[in-house]
Amino acid sequence: MKGKLLMAGGIAFVLVAGLVDAARWPRPYPVSLSTAKPASQTSDDGHVAARPETKNDILIDAQNARPAPAIASGEWINSEPVKLEALRGRVVLVDFWTFGCYNCRNTLPTLKRLDSAYRKRGLTIIGVHSPEFDREKRIENVRREVGSLGIDYAVVTDNDYETWRAYGVEAWPTVVILDKRGRVRFMHIGEGLYDEQESVIKQLLAE
């Protein structure tokens, strides 16, 4: 009987602890993801086939694409505050990350390469820094890490997770690519699919 009582008490403690922890996050609790299994379909010419469904890892058909939510106000690094409306005519890659995320760091070489290769051709990259821990909320820490990581594109803090929630993000890192009319055309969670992302950028720049 004593053993059963101890077990019941342990289960109750775990449940209460889980509820308390869940209350810390006003959204689905995020996780860091490693390389995800590719789900896109790439043709022989390197193009990602457009589909009407609004799923991850596919190029969403323009007629079915939803307008991208606004980027909430925050502290901007490497740029003055930017509104998506001002970027009409440009392809925009929004990268949800946090500097303490190992998987996010693994994506940075590709993001920096894409920025260098396509900025003058019409691509804008915005890093939305949605923190996991308190130390990642301090602007001085974010500025330091952005500098030390060699990030030249715009970064905006999202300490209250407003932009995170608006885009329905659930994990770090998540990449969202918008077309020239500000519509969500591609979304990928985790590392990987770098070639597919570049192909999507090329296709959207050509539209």
PLM feature spans:
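A short beta-strand-turn-helix
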Residues: 70-92, 115-118
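N-proximal helix/coil linker or "cap" segments that precede and/or mark the start of modular domains
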Residues: 20-72, 88, 207
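Hydrophobic membrane-insertion alpha-helices, especially the h-region
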Residues: 8-21
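Proline-centered helix-kink/hinge sites
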Residues: 69, 102-103, 109-113, 154, ...
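Positively charged n-region of N-terminal signal peptides that target proteins for export
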Residues: 1-4
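Short active-site neighborhood of thiol/selenol oxidoreductases, capturing the structured segment around
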Residues: 82-105, 111, 125
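Thiol/disulfide oxidoreductase modules built on the thioredoxin-like
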Residues: 90, 145-153, 157-202
